[in-house]
Amino acid sequence: MESDYNDIVAEYYDFEADSFERRAGENHVLKTLRNDFREFTLSRRPKKMLEIGYGPGLDMTWFADRNDIEIVHGVDISPEFQRIVENKARQRGDGKILPNLGSAEDIVEIVGESAVDTVYVYFGGLNTVNDLESVASAISKVLKPGGSAILTFVNRWYLFEIFWNILLLRPRRAFSRLRPVWNGYSPTRSLPSYCPTAREIGHKFGQFLNPVYRKGYCILHPAWYRKHWAPFNSVRSRSLYLMDRILQRTPLWNFGEYSLYIFESTDKE
């Protein structure tokens, strides 16, 4: 069953692989969020890193370009993404990026215990895992004592999406993330996923790691797939980002498109 699901996810991303990097570079909302994710990651002073769900290697190469980063391991379920990043690794020739093929559940076998000081997952790579609790345990094992995990998730409760689709008389789409299986963003291609709540994430990861920080994104600012509603650097975009920052201090922080969580490894006996 686990293998069948992993095959479905791998096939989905293999199809997307060739155009993934171009589309990511063209989307100003994705770029803004990615820059913020990276800044939070750098604030943890990483040296030996692991990315789960590395895609075309945008972040692996970005971190590897920094002199203070020693090595960036990666684990991704897509053979096409691995091929793309292996080509980038060969072109670099410095041995700093190591793309591996596998699932999030495989990371202990791939990189070993206490192998890295930082694990990061951007743009909801853990929304497509079989068992989030087992992944939380695996992340805690690969981290060195005092290491950090910077994790982002597609939110379960995205209030704007719910209200907008209700107004458009699309109740099925309005509540699609609340179902046991969410089919992803594409209206034509299904990616079976699960959107956990902040409480679920805190409970499952809190068994193995200490929570340090959390932040929500695109609470009022349009999500990446509605980037045209707030053009780059427009007054509307800047104003909505400001309002999102204000809402971070309220219970609405977790009702946007994405949330980021930082967890820290405890000392291991």
What does each model-found stretch correspond to?
Residues 199, 203, 213-269:
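A C-terminal cap/extension of S-adenosyl-L-methionine-dependent methyltransferases
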Residues 58-106:
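Class I SAM-dependent methyltransferase SAM/SAH-binding core
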Residues 133-145:
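A short glycine-rich, Lys/Arg-flanked "PGG" loop and its adjoining helix->strand segment in the class I
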Residues 1-44, 58-62, 150-177:
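Conserved class I S-adenosyl-L-methionine
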Residues 184-200:
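Acceptor-substrate binding/catalytic loop of class I
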Residues 118-131:
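A short SAM/SAH-binding and catalytic strip from SAM-dependent methyltransferases
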Residues 109-119:
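A short acidic, Gly/Pro-enriched loop at the edge of an enzyme's catalytic core
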